[in-house]
Design a protein with these regions (language model features):
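Core transmembrane alpha-helical segments of multi-pass membrane transporters/permeases
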Residues: 45, 69-103, 279, 287, ...
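Membrane-core helix-loop-helix motifs of multi-pass transport proteins
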Residues: 155-254, 419-457, 463-466
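Membrane-interfacial loop-to-helix junctions in multi-pass transporters
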Residues: 19-23, 75-82, 109-129, 158-168, ...
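Long, contiguous bundles of hydrophobic transmembrane helices that form the permeation core
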Residues: 2-26, 30, 206-312, 440, ...
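Re-entrant/interfacial helical elements at transmembrane boundaries that shape
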Residues: 89-90, 103-107, 144-157, 186-197, ...
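Hydrophobic alpha-helical transmembrane segments of multi-pass integral membrane proteins
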Residues: 84-88, 114-155, 328, 353-393, ...
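Transmembrane alpha-helix interface/packing and boundary motifs in multi-pass membrane proteins
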Residues: 33-40, 92-93, 132-141, 173-181, ...
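Hydrophobic mid-bilayer segments of alpha-helices in multi-pass membrane transport proteins
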Residues: 22-34, 40-62, 81-89, 171, ...
Length: 466
């Protein structure tokens, strides 16, 4: 990220553009981009065109920007995320192709869903998936790792529960979003807060717990409402029509459920508990899956050969290349925005928002998460803007940490976000199908929770302990 930013900063402005006009162009380009992707436009093409429009409208030299800043952003993103993505996606492919995901789904069905019927049965499936996302998030699974390993499980649960796919991405991401905001979890929002604010992962825990409780309450109310609504409309499992590759209906477990959870348990213990390198642990998990799931990964002939493994792993490699393109496009757009001459003015406005300083700080962290291209970078930007003046404004470091944990999650899940695209494409959905549920469980509920958290921090500073 630093390399991309530094190379961009060295690019001279081609011509002067009034600050107000440049900011209008940036905001308009972003809004049109979000709408286009929501309506089904290719996000790589849309982000590239938006970057060009921003260059023209803000005075950045378009040739230098598109030939230097944008490729450098792609390279930086690949350097940071490629191996992690590759291992996550291959592991998810192994779970789906072997039937291990089906085994985990059946285990969950026996333990949680039981013999319930009708709408109650469907509701239990959805609430169970929300809980799975929350538990795995608390366990240290970040969004991408959870998406690529748990979506196959979710698809099998959705088929068994006769639920439409449109609800799955929002349900899983709702649980993960709650975990990201929860004090004490080993996720980026908490870990990076230690670096930027010098606080503990449990900073301002009481407001944080209240905020997460509000998020989950909104999620549950929404799930109860939407499942009944879909049931009345007669909406059912629609994966077969969309070409989602699934084991045949009614197929018995090809992989023992206990064996199926071993790779996930391995990741939890080694990454979350022991703090080992994620890529190395994922690679070992892939080897474990290849060995433990061998009864499920079979070629057409009775004899097990390496060709089937090659097909599954090859499909994972192809999906990785596609996802890196989506992620790189979003990151490149963020780098273009950050390096416009109007960006410093835009961020400077945050400190001038009238009223309680916590309001301006919340807005800065929320918008920073989008413009900087990630929630972590958004938290870094908010701390850089408000850190030097926090004491004079009466803002404490623990409060900044906890508010930022909620705020950066709000606009980090807009339609052009890599995790949102990954979750949507993994379910073979269009953005307009999946995003209404995602917006409710990761944007609207988090916004409400953040407002409550900011109010608690401002009204009861004694609750904001580091």
């Amino acid at each position: 990220m630093a390399e991309a930013a530094s190379s961009a900063a060295a690019t001279a402005v081609a011509y002067a553009v009034p600050t107000a006009l440049g900011i209008i162009v940036i905001l308009a380009a972003v809004l049109v981009l979000m709408y286009a992707v929501y309506k089904g436009a290719n996000s790589i093409l849309a982000c590239t065109l938006a970057s060009m429009v921003i260059c023209i409208g803000t005075g950045l030299p378009i040739v230098d920007t598109m030939e230097t800043i944008v490729p450098n952003a792609y390279a930086t993103q690949i350097q940071m995320m490629f191996m992690k993505f590759l291992c996550c996606i291959i592991l998810g492919q192994l779970y789906q192709a072997s039937g291990a995901a089906l085994s985990v789904a059946h285990l969950v069905e026996k333990v949680v869903v039981g013999k319930s019927t009708g709408t109650a049965r469907k509701t239990r499936y959805v609430l169970c998936m929300l809980g799975i996302g929350l538990v795995f998030g608390i366990g240290g699974f970040d969004t991408f790792l959870a998406v690529f390993t748990l979506i196959p499980v979710g698809l099998n649960m959705w088929r068994d529960g006769d639920l439409p796919r449109a609800l799955l991405p929002g349900t899983l991401m709702g649980g993960l979003s709650a975990a990201a905001c929860l004090p004490g979890t080993p996720l980026f929002a908490n870990m990076m807060g230690q670096m930027f604010f010098g606080t503990n992962t449990t900073a301002a825990r009481i407001p944080g717990y209240v905020g997460v409780a509000i998020m989950l309450a909104i999620d549950v109310v929404y799930i109860l409402h939407i499942v009944k609504k879909y049931d009345k409309k007669g909406l059912h499992w629609d994966g077969d029509e969309a070409g989602v590759e699934m084991p045949p209906p009614g197929e018995k477990d090809r992989v023992n459920p206990i064996l199926a959870i071993i790779p996930l348990a391995w990741i939890f213990v080694t990454v979350t508990v022991l703090g080992k390198d994620m890529v190395v642990c994922l690679f070992v998990a892939i080897i474990l899956a290849c060995v433990l799931f061998c009864n499920g990964i079979k070629a057409e002939t009775p004899r097990l050969t390496g060709s089937k493994y090659g097909q599954v792993i090859g499909a994972g490699c192809t999906q990785t290349a596609v996802m890196m393109g989506f992620m790189g496009a979003q990151f490149a757009l963020a780098q273009v925005v950050i390096n416009t001459p109007q960006f410093d003015t835009l961020t400077g406005w945050f400190t001038k928002i009238p009223g309680n300083p916590y309001i301006g700080y919340s807005v800065a962290a929320s918008l920073g998460g989008f413009f900087a291209g990630s929630s972590v970078a958004g938290m870094q930007m908010a701390s850089a803007i408000y850190g030097p003046i926090a004491d004079s404004l009466g803002i404490t470091a623990p409060a900044m940490h906890r508010i930022a944990a909620f705020a950066v999650s709000i606009l980090d899940t807009i339609p052009i976000n890599g995790a949102v695209i990954a979750t949507t494409t993994s379910c073979k959905l269009k953005m307009k199908q999946s995003y209404p549920a995602i917006a409710m469980t990761t944007v609207i509920n988090v916004t409400v929770a953040m407002i409550v958290v900011a109010f608690m921090c401002a009204a009861f500073p004694g609750l904001c302990q580091s």
